[in-house]
Structure formats: structure tokens, C-alpha cells
Amino acid sequence: MALRARTPLLLAALAGVVVALRLSGAAEARVLLTLDDFGAVGDGIANDTQALVDAWNAACGTDDNTYLNVPAGKSYQIWPVTLAGPCRDEIKLLISGNIIAPESPDEWRGGDQGRWLHFSGVSDLAVSGGGIIDGRGQQWWALAENSTSGQEAAAAAPKALHFADCQDVAVNGLTLQNSQREHLVFTRCSSVEANYLRVTSPEHSPGTVGVLLVSSTNVHVMDDLFSVGGDCVSIVGNCTDVRLRAISCGPGHGISIGGLGENGSLHKAEKIKMDTMFISNTKYGVRVKTYEGGCGTARKVKFAQIVMKNVSNPIIIDQNYSASNRGTPCGTPNASAVAVGEIDYIDITGTSATERAMTFACSDAMPCSRLSLTRVNLTRVGGGSASAYCHRAFGKNVGDVVPASCLCKEDFVRRQAPTAGALQGDTEGDADW
């Protein structure tokens, strides 16, 4: 669809029909815009993309704090669109109604198939309102399932709600459902909130990640419910200062850091805290995964107060994540790897759907170091004992650990595996990060 750029005069005329709240003597002027004022139909059939573009341009060009409302009781069909900043002042996007995607993948032809609702270079944006963003991804999933190259077809599906190069963004109190692929993505963003969300898609919908964080910093993902076909939360690239709390995850693939180091890249995932989570009926619980041949670190990670129920692989570190990694190693061939260490597992309890409850499959080139298991109790569903597997994994145990830990002691690292624990960055004096 060709989106037309309206003239400033027309924008001014359209803005004239909205409600302008300018209270005499008020400390802050506010402007209220609604999508319908810009010609939106909201019947779920008409293409309302141009109305959204015009409304966004009006809001973005306003000098005052602006509220842009997607009214309740209506469904607005929006085709692939980019809403760009920078804007002149704060924008509050209130999604009270429904925003739905076109059902057919054909509507992405000639454009960027990787995006649906794309925000670029925006600061001070709050998205809330209690409404629904529905990707209607069924036809995309069918393409992936029926294609001879299903993985490639799934990878080509668009990200539903995508923020790139944005700052001070909050997405709160929405339902995101049936995404074509990832539901909510933050790429190279800082100071981000994604709270009080309900994110759902069928268990077998390919690649339907809940929240994907890519090279973003100072991120809070809290008080959310995920029931998806992929990872509930996935953290990749160079992410730091990430906080996950009060999350329900399942079904899906659990919570994942990585894969890091894909195609010989340098990635650092650091200062990541996750606690107070319930993970049920998932393929994995909490997972750290890295590619061979990559560089960088996964360090200062805490998993705490997590209850697992019928999880196939509750705790896993996999430093040989994919044999399909084709990039040139960023270090010495056959001797480079992302360094994994300073990973704490505290108060992890529940049941494993498989015999192996803990897997630490670390790299020969760069073994895992400074792992810590504190009060871990994972038993097998239906009774029976679970087990743990370790390869080149070093660390310590505190309190009772079930199944019995297989971690090697750290002093063995210094004597036998000097490359282990070669984590980059200062590790002293920051125990309370």
C-alpha cells in the first residue's frame, strides 16, 4: 500500500477536529487525538493504515504532550507500517480497541516482510490502553509448516510490534496474540518497560516468541503472562541490565539467553536478573545458549525463585547450540567461544518431564566457570530420580542440590583449565549488581 504524506495544512485541519485540552494556567498542555478523526473506519475490513500514519504524524509534530487513542469497541486493520521519530514531545498511544493485521502474507509483497507495526527512533513513548494487537498469523504459520524450507519461511515472517533505536518506551497492559513470528521486539533500545502483558499464540505456532530483546539496555519485563510457540522471553545480541520478574511462561520454549556468538560475532549479555517465575509445560526452563566460534561473554546472570512444572529441560547451558553456524570464528579457529560464567541458580524447584533436569554442556575451548547452584530441588514427574549432566562446567553448590550436582570445583579450573573463567570485564566489588 502506498501511504500518502499529507500536507501540514491538512494535518492542521484534521487536528482541528480533535479535542485539545489546554487548561488555563495548567503546568502542562495536553492534546487528545483519536484515530477516527483521521478517517479510520474501524470495521476490521477497511484498510485504516493511512489514518494511523496521519494521526501519528500529527501527534509527532505537536509541541505538547499528546494522547493518541485507538477507540474501544472497534477493530482497525493496519497493514505494514513504520512510525518514525524523533517527535517533539511525549506521546501516549492508548490502544483501547483492536489493531489487527491483514490475514494474507501477500500484503507484505514489495515491502519489508520482517515488520508489521514498526516504531523507529522514537523517545518518550507509552503504549497502553488494555486493547488487543492481533497478528492473525495463521497463514504465516501454514507457510512455515508446509514449506520445504520451513525454518526459512518462519524466519521471513514479520515481527508484530517492533521498536528499533528507541529510548524511554513503555508497553503496558495490552494483549498481544497470534503474531506472525515475534510478538514484541526491542532492538537497540534503552530504558524499556514491558509490563502487565498477556501474550498468547498456539503452542505449535512456529517461532512465536513472546518478547525478544536485541542489543538493548535497562529493560524491565514484569508481571506478564506468556503462552506461545517459541521462547517466552529471548535475550540476544549485546544486552545489559535486564530485569525479568513475576512471569508466567508456558507452553513454549521457556526463557532463553542466546544464541550468542552466531556467525562468529561478538556478543555480551551481562547483568541479567530473573526471579519470581512460574514455568510450566515447556520444552526448556531457563537456558543459556551460545554458538561455536563466537566471542564475548554471558555473565552476571541470576535465576532465582523459579517454580518449574513438567518442564522437559529445566536448567540448561548449551555452548554448542547449532551445527549450522557458518560464520568465520572471531578468534582462533576451533578455539574461540563465548565465555559463560558467573551464573547463579537460586531456589529453583519443581518437576522435570525428562530424566535429565540439569545440563551444563560447556565448551572445550572456553569451559563454563563460576556457576553456582543454591537450594535447587528438581524431581522427575511421576516420581523417580532426575539427573544432572556436566561437560567442562565449573562452580560450587550451596545448600541441598537435587539432583546431585556434577559441577567441578573452581580450584580445578586454575590447575587444569586455565582458559576457563576468562571472563571479560571487572568482576570485583559488584556482588550486588
Language-model region placement:
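Extracellular/periplasmic carbohydrate-active domains that bind, remodel
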Residues: A2-W433
